[in-house]
């Protein structure tokens, strides 16, 4: 069974030949794993600039080696990306650089917003006056390269992720500053709504281009927007339904028109929103942050497992960073025993793998999952 068949079958709540595997990790960890497995390439391709999930523009230098690493770990998914090809972005002495929407970003791993250009915005006019056209030019991305990656990965039999990451609320917070934006949701809802419309419209228009370019070669629209924290939702369910749900629904309807599956990354405790996600057409929920309130994987499987698939759940807060290889192996077994019945489960970390996690634990997770994750033997663990 090829990876695409394996993934789509499990999303449809059927048992494939084995539990599908995926990975999410910062580039520093990917590079360390490349060295851990002594993966060599004769000639690395020319580096390209990519817009990361957070909008940080970063340079990917070891793309060929990363693809070989994915093969080594038996990863069933591949991402297709549209490299940034717009005007040269200013790089500052501290290593930070300008990113999407004109936000200066820098810092570890994903990068953080160092400035909030709409922090002082108080009116709709303030939002409209921002030079959106300068920072949201859809022609600044190489969609032909994106289409070629979709074609390549599709022909190789992988499940292909396509479309923009589309973190709608994330960007509104970075533009205005999280504190100001959260206050505006209550005190100036028309201003907050206008800002969210701006971020959503950019990603919707970009999605239309990417979906068309990847038509027939893309399997899953995987987007991310965080609505939870460790102990609950970031804002009330009513606020989420008013300000963000309509934009998700619009994007998901577009993706469904291309026959794509929908996968959402939303950190933290989001159990309260899962019924809404399902009603709006979500197929797969990621990353199942197991340490957050209400996110016990087997309980989610029991309550929602007939209607939605789960992606993630290998604990990056406790087991992977602080456990030993035997504890990692035990958690893989536990996930298989409690989550894989009837399909609907993809094993992956519960958040991005960071450099604090021992490489031996990461290797143990994937080696164990591949060795023992075959149906029907998975039930004998």
Task: Report residues per predicted region.
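A generic hydrophobic-helix recognition signal that picks specific residues
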Residues: 67, 92-95, 170
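Active-site loop segments of alpha/beta catalytic cores
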Residues: 1-44, 59, 98, 103-381
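Feature targets compositionally biased, intrinsically disordered low-complexity regions
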Residues: 51-54, 94, 110, 132
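N-terminal catalytic cores of secreted or lumenal carbohydrate-active enzymes
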Residues: 78-90, 96-99, 136-137, 151
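Segments that shape or occlude catalytic/ligand-binding pockets
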Residues: 32-87
